[in-house]
Amino acid sequence: MAQTVTARRSRGDERRLRILAAAAELIADRGYHAVSMTDIGVSAGVVGPAIYRHFNSKADLLAALFEQVIDTLLVRASAIVEQSHDDNLALTQLVADHVSLVIEQRELAIVYYREVHNLAESQRSRLRRKQRLYLDEWVHVLGELRPELDETELRATVHGAIGAVQSILQYRDTGMAPDRVPTLLARMGHSVLGVQRFCPEGIASTQRDPDTDMPKR
């Protein structure tokens, strides 16, 4: 009996993840209001009203996508800061982790970047609280490396760096080789932060990237 319940729960979790992935892909491509729960269910291979066993509404599904992003970012950021022995290394890893989100989970990141205005106010408030905690991790580390900045300046700088990394989400095609994009985004983030990237040898990379022209929209 216990094994049956566990297997059923596992199938339910897997189906829920399929629904979230399908929703992220469709909403990123069409926009929130142009996608229906039926569209999402069909894309996820969930028949009829079965999708409502996992999400009461499209609004709840959208909120779950935002929770998925911010919870993952927050857990990873906390682990990076807690486990790192070097502030420069920690900041480099924070930048790299955010770059990884926008590159490897592009559809999910696009929804996070574009659709916050479609969340209910209570959901936006909860999201903002978690976002502040995420920013706090960056601000704490950057404050150790940039002691000349006050709290307001540190937060503005972190916002700018994250915005620079997420700017790639405005473009469907960057015109660059895929393997060059993460390096460019990391360089942009560190440029805004005013802190060079950590290297194991103790010398941060300052080599200029010749392909720094902004991509065409």
Identify the residue ranges that each predicted region occupies.
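C-terminal peripheral helix-coil segments that are non-catalytic and often amphipathic
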Residues: M1-Q3, S100, D136, H140-E144, ...
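Hydrophobic alpha-helical connector segments
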Residues: A64, S78-E104
